[in-house]
Curated annotation (Swiss-Prot):
InterPro entries to which the protein is assigned, alphabetical: Arg_succ_lyase_C, Argininosuccinate_lyase, Fumarase/histidase_N, Fumarate_lyase_CS, Fumarate_lyase_fam, Fumarate_lyase_N, L-Aspartase-like
Gene Ontology BP annotations: arginine biosynthetic process via ornithine; L-arginine biosynthetic process
Catalytic reaction list: 2-(N(omega)-L-arginino)succinate = fumarate + L-arginine
Family of this protein: Belongs to the lyase 1 family. Argininosuccinate lyase subfamily.
E.C. number(s) listed in UniProt: 4.3.2.1
This protein's name: Argininosuccinate lyase
């Protein structure tokens, strides 16, 4: 416990006073003031805080709580303060706790007693909830823009690779041939769902808590709908207790952010594998890689590796917010000061990761021949041979058994099924004829046969890309 031998109201170095002080008989201990302050991190809300205050003052003048002259003085003062902050001349003071009190104190310093009227009908509880929602709404819009750019990059790369054949994997073992374009469209679909989740989250973020005051509302004749219109909110909150106390909208964002990072991490894992000497499927340009301080030959895929690593911190940010909120009674508690850093970190990490991916993906260079050669290893057309037999009347389980024996021969002779002779294949079934090579065993036959919506045939991939462009137009309209 920090103690002091100074008189209760002295201006001792380890004490400070706040703007809420009337009820207190001694100043706040200096360490406690620093420990409980949030201005070190919530100052990034300054634009939203000032916008909210301007709207609040405008509304107070409309309902007659402020005069028009007082409103104009407040707006002019707040506009000047914003300019000071952006010029780097504003002095942020820890003894004033947070962004709200720092700005209000400076306003009062500039325009006098009128500045003290700004907080009429408002609490920091609804003020900060409004700031967070305004800030998060802006950040969601920025993140959606990055998602759109990444999605367009994926579609552009997919369009160049509708005929590029590569092995598809299950259990990281060769499964069936797919086109590289089809694989890229799988990533695209994941990001579409991420986009839809964020857009849906934004709808719930875009509800205005301002006017809820501390917890029960205010006695002043406020016009919340007018304030909401000024700030671009779709609606006002329905319950004052809920409006100031819950942060589920921030949790929802962090959950959506976690899913984005999970998808980016999976993409990163594949890129890391594909750029290795063991795969060599793709080349990442040098500008997205680094080298080794000791091994001259190294070209490390640092961007996807970092994004894979950063996914864990965003998951942690989600758990931090869930844990923060789970034990709180209504309404506002000081615990909620801890909501900002996990939210900020998730926002910053997702934004940076998407920016890196949006720049990197269009620049990827596939090694087409190496991909094709890899698809020829691992008996990727085995299922096609089984389907070939089924179409000739063999029950699927029997066909499965027949092809399994053919694969065993291929393993023994170190040959792909397409490299076995017709005579070798016919020893397992006399229904296998010369057309098997064109209809089942070539890579092109395999991918072309999957000619349905969602399939990997080049024709379907081209159609899927065309549909995807239209979906993007609708998604971001």
């Amino acid at each position: 416990m920090t103690t002091s031998s100074n008189p209760p109201n002295s201006a001792a170095p380890n004490q400070t006073s706040g703007m809420w002080g009337g009820r207190f008989s001694e100043a706040t201990d200096a360490f406690v003031a620093e420990f409980t302050a949030s201005v070190q991190f919530d100052q990034r809300f300054y634009k939203q805080d000032i916008a909210g205050s301007i709207a609040h003052a405008t509304m107070l003048a409309k309902v007659g709580v402020l005069t028009e002259a007082e409103r104009d003085d407040i707006i002019e003062g707040l506009s000047t303060i914003r300019a000071e902050i952006e010029a780097g001349t504003f002095e942020w003071r820890i003894d004033l706790e947070d962004v709200h009190m720092n700005i209000e104190s400076r306003l009062t310093q500039r325009i006098g007693i009128t500045g003290k009227k700004l907080h009429t009908g408002r609490s920091r509880n609804d003020q900060v909830a409004t700031d967070i929602r305004l800030y998060l709404r802006d950040e969601i819009d920025d993140i959606l823009g990055l998602l759109e750019r990444l999605q367009k990059g994926l579609l552009g790369l997919a369009a160049k690779n509708v005929n590029t054949i590569m092995p598809g994997f299950t259990h990281l073992q060769t499964a069936q041939p797919v086109t590289f374009g089809h694989h890229l469209l799988a990533w695209f679909e994941m990001l579409v769902r991420d986009t839809e989740r964020l857009q849906d989250c934004r709808k719930r973020v875009n509800r205005m808590p301002l006017g809820s005051a501390a917890l029960a509302g205010t006695t002043y004749p406020i016009d919340r709908a007018y304030t909401a219109e000024l700030l671009g909110f779709e609606a006002v909150s329905e319950n004052s207790l809920d409006a100031v106390s819950d942060r589920d909208f921030a949790i929802e964002f962090n959950a959506a952010a976690s899913l984005i990072m999970m998808h980016l991490s999976r993409m990163s894992e594949e890129l890391i594998l594909w750029t290795s000497a063991q795969f060599k499927f793709v080349n990442i340009p040098d500008r997205f890689c680094t080298g080794s301080s000791i091994m001259p030959q190294k070209k490390n895929p640092d961007v996807p590796e970092l994004i894979r690593g950063k996914s864990g911190r965003v998951f942690g940010d989600l758990i931090s917010l869930l844990t923060l909120m789970k034990g709180q009674p209504l309404a506002y508690n000081k615990d909620n000061q801890e909501d900002k850093e996990p939210l900020f970190d998730a926002i910053d990490t997702v934004r940076g990761s998407l920016m890196a991916f949006a720049d990197m993906i269009p620049a990827l260079v596939p090694n087409v021949e190496i991909m094709r050669e890899a698809a020829l290893r691992g008996f990727s057309t085995a299922t096609d041979l089984a389907d070939y037999l089924v179409k000739k009347g063999v029950a699927f389980r029997d066909a499965h058994e027949i092809v399994g024996k053919a694969v065993a021969l291929g393993v023994a002779e170190e040959k792909d099924l397409s490299e076995l002779t017709l005579e070798q294949l016919q020893q397992f079934s006399d229904l296998i004829t010369a057309d098997v090579f064109d209809k089942a065993l070539t890579l092109e036959a395999s991918v072309n046969a999957r000619d349905h919506i969602g399939g990997t045939s080049p024709k379907q991939v081209e159609a899927a890309i065309a549909r995807a462009h239209k979906r993007l137009e609708q998604l971001y309209a």
